[in-house]
Structures are given as C-alpha cells and as structure tokens.
Regions:
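Glycine-rich phosphate-binding loops of nucleotide-dependent enzymes
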Residues: 1-79
C-alpha cells in the first residue's frame, strides 16, 4: 500500500494501520517497504520465489539465516 507514497504519507499510513490494530482488526499486507513492515507488524511471513522461508516477529525474521541468505546474500567465507 505504500508504493509511490512520500514520507509524510507513509507516516500517516502507519498511524492509520496502528489505529485499526488498536480496534482489534487483523490486517494482511503485502509490502516491500521494510520500514513500514517492521514498524506495524506483529507477525511477518517472508517469501522467496513464492515459498515461505520464515515467519515470526519482526526481530525473529530479520535474524533468520534463510532471510539473510535470500535477501542479503552470503559472504565469500560462507560459500
């Protein structure tokens, strides 16, 4: 939902999503803006080529070795 939004609009979107969460709504969001995802999500599913490679809290998925390998690559020492 944040594609093409400026920083102010993204902040307003995050505030709106949080207001819905406080009211008890569950939100399914497909998004590539990781700042937005990490700031509003309680649980994240990470996909790579259509396959779920990790799920968990934001802290868990950013530390997951599969996520790091898929999105940041491996160092030369690991290959």
């Amino acid at each position: 939902p944040a594609a093409g939004m400026n920083p102010q609009e993204r902040e307003e979107l995050m505030a709106f999503i949080r207001s819905l969460q406080r009211k008890g709504f569950t939100i399914l969001m497909i998004e590539h803006d990781m700042n937005l995802v990490m700031n509003v999500s309680e649980r994240i599913y990470v996909m790579d080529y259509g396959k779920v490679i990790a799920s968990g809290t934001p802290e868990e998925v950013v530390a997951d070795p599969e996520v790091i390998r898929a999105y940041l690559g491996e160092s030369e020492e690991e290959t």
